[in-house]
Amino acid sequence: MAKMINKTLVLTYIYLLIYIILSSGVILYNKWVLSPKYFNFPLPITLTMIHMGFSGFVAFLLIRVFKVVSPVKMTFEIYVTCVVPISAFFASSLWFGNTAYLHISVAFIQMLKALMPVATFLMAVVCGTDKARCDVFMNMVLVSVGVVVSSYGEINFNVIGTVYQVMGIFAEALRLVLTQVLLQKKGLTLNPVTSLYYIAPCSFVFLSLPWYVLEKPNIDVSQIQFNFWIFFSNALCALALNFSIFLVIGRTGAVTIRVAGVLKDWILIALSTVIFPESTITGLNITGYAIALCGVVMYNYIKIKDVKAIQPTTDSLPDRITKDWKEKNSSDGGSPRGLELNDEEAPLITSRLSHIGRTQLGNHTAV
């Protein structure tokens, strides 16, 4: 039994490492592809559509052709009232986020992403899924102050890029809240493959509208570099990232995932300054981000306490692994209740869809 637990723990940390590598890699890869200074494919909507098309195609093969995964019962009413609005905001968050790469550095983007819990909390309060609380509000103020300080210290500050990134953050926050509000009412449970199957094509359609207006008129085929292997590997990495998120969720607890997320952000900031020399980090950048990070950590601590208050008998990781092994749960069943891991670079809806019908707890996480 001890050997089984040790082996499982090793696998858990391997999955965490894979998640950190893939998440950082996809962000850096997208920046490299889109940046005029490098691969020079300044078409963020087109790149996002490639991700959506590839993801939807893979999901179709797995469900309809190879029948590896069974389809879920999806009615027209659920599709229109749930999948369509969620897909719209999901597509918007990816579009805005990828567009930001054209204007601001990866390091500054990661610092701005510290606003994610602020945006999610505000959207949750507006939609009635969370209550305004003084302790959380103070954390949100701390995060906001940190981001403002970090922005003030940004040497290459760009208003357009900053606005796009903030819009992407709020679109993603609204997507998370809508996922909870809409799908929870329907009791719908989707795993990563079935969520790909329904979300990706719908997101592709939504993206085609701004693409037709903003990018199609400016596309000069003779000046565009289209390397099949570059785009294939880019889409494949994005797809692999989502599945790594699913594996991590099934094997770790809330604290571990949050620590991994913070570690990933710091690694990404450091790597981006090495890979993209034009990315300059100032002392004020670091100070502001550290302030914001304190607020994020305190916010996560409060949310973890909320989860433990509702589930006072939560098992430790080894105990939960042993319990899951004894009960022979599937990887989907091993997902910790009330936990949501979100990564804006993943090309589909993440963990909330895999357990939305089994929990009444909305716990929002910034990754």
From Swiss-Prot:
Pfam families: TPT. Residues 321-341 are annotated as: Disordered. One of its GO terms (cellular component) is membrane. It is found in: Membrane. Residues 321-330 have a biased composition (Basic and acidic residues). The chain crosses the membrane at residues 9-29, 43-63, 76-96, 106-126, 140-160, 163-183, 193-213, 229-249, 257-276, 280-302. It is a multi-pass membrane protein. Keywords: Membrane, Sugar transport, Transmembrane, Transmembrane helix, Transport. It comes from the Eukaryota. Belongs to the TPT transporter family. TPT (TC 2.A.7.9) subfamily. This is Probable sugar phosphate/phosphate translocator At1g48230. The lineage of its organism: Eukaryota, Viridiplantae, Streptophyta, Embryophyta, Tracheophyta.
